[in-house]
Amino acid sequence: MLGIIGGSGLYNLPGIKVKEEVQVKTPFGEPSSPVVIAEVEGKKVAFLARHGRGHEYPPHLVPYRANLWALREVGVKRVLGISAVGGINELLMPGDFVVIHDYLDFTKTRRSTYYEGKFSVKVEGEDKVAKLLREGKVVHVDMSEAYCPEMRKVLIQILKEKNFRFHPKGVYACTEGPRFETPSEIKMLKLLGADVVGMTGYPEVALARELTMCYASLCVVANPAAGIAGYRLTSNEVIQLMKRKEEEIKEVVLKFIKELPEIRSCDCEKSLEGAEV
């Protein structure tokens, strides 16, 4: 099953049939929202609001571990994360889609792994994840190809067919937030190779990898980053841009649900092979 993490507006996809709403209790706390299980074109899909339905969770306090675990509990094997970002690369314009291929992590206070050695939370189950946690193993997952190539390929093809302005690659720099970045920080990120900057892309991608899930990130450039814009940044600007792009986002997501193959042909599910110490 596919899981989608984004805004609650995605629950209103054309043709969606909501089947149930599940309040999942996880060993890592409460997720930021109930998981909505729906059916689209005969396929089951799980939706989760990253910041909560009323946007109650700032980026540094989103319960990322609980969110990914909750999706795992309802049977999700693939996750599509949707988010707004600031543009660092001058080729990026407000409203552009970006299919992320790599990231830089500049977060500070977030719990970004399930595998904490002897301090790991012990869980029930006979799968590899549960066994590693019960045994208190230290795990180092490979992030050479952090985002699922199969999911990225489908997203890129859809964006081409829709003729939406998009970029097939992009490096996402994740900062702690909730404040916006300074112009000097953006200069630094640009020198390090970042194309976009956001506050929620990490640790979602790494946690999904630790759970052997596929993960892809579809970003929308909401505004130029600090120092590039030449004006004061506001949250309202981001909100208004995302509202204008809402229908296009829904079009992409709906087609993605339809066209994503049922059976995985990538290596994401092998992420724990050789990873334990």
Curated annotation (Swiss-Prot):
Enzyme class (EC, first level): transferase
Residues binding phosphate: S8, R50, H51, S83, A84, T200
Entry keywords, A to Z: Glycosyltransferase, Purine salvage, Transferase
GO molecular function per UniProt: S-methyl-5-thioadenosine phosphorylase activity
Documented EC number(s): 2.4.2.1
Catalytic activity: a purine D-ribonucleoside + phosphate = a purine nucleobase + alpha-D-ribose 1-phosphate
Origin: domain of life: Bacteria
Name of one Pfam family that matches: PNP_UDP_1
SUPFAM superfamilies, per the entry: Purine and uridine phosphorylases
One biological process term in Gene Ontology: L-methionine salvage from methylthioadenosine
Similarity comment: Belongs to the PNP/MTAP phosphorylase family. MTAP subfamily.
Miscellaneous section: Although this enzyme belongs to the family of MTA phosphorylases based on sequence homology, it has been shown that conserved amino acid substitutions in the substrate binding pocket convert the substrate specificity of this enzyme from 6-aminopurines to 6-oxopurines.
NCBIfam families membership: MTAP, PRK09136.1
PANTHER family, alphabetized: S-METHYL-5'-THIOADENOSINE PHOSPHORYLASE
Function: Purine nucleoside phosphorylase which is highly specific for 6-oxopurine nucleosides. Cleaves guanosine or inosine to respective bases and sugar-1-phosphate molecules. Involved in purine salvage.
Protein name: Probable 6-oxopurine nucleoside phosphorylase
UniProt organism field: Aquifex aeolicus (strain VF5)
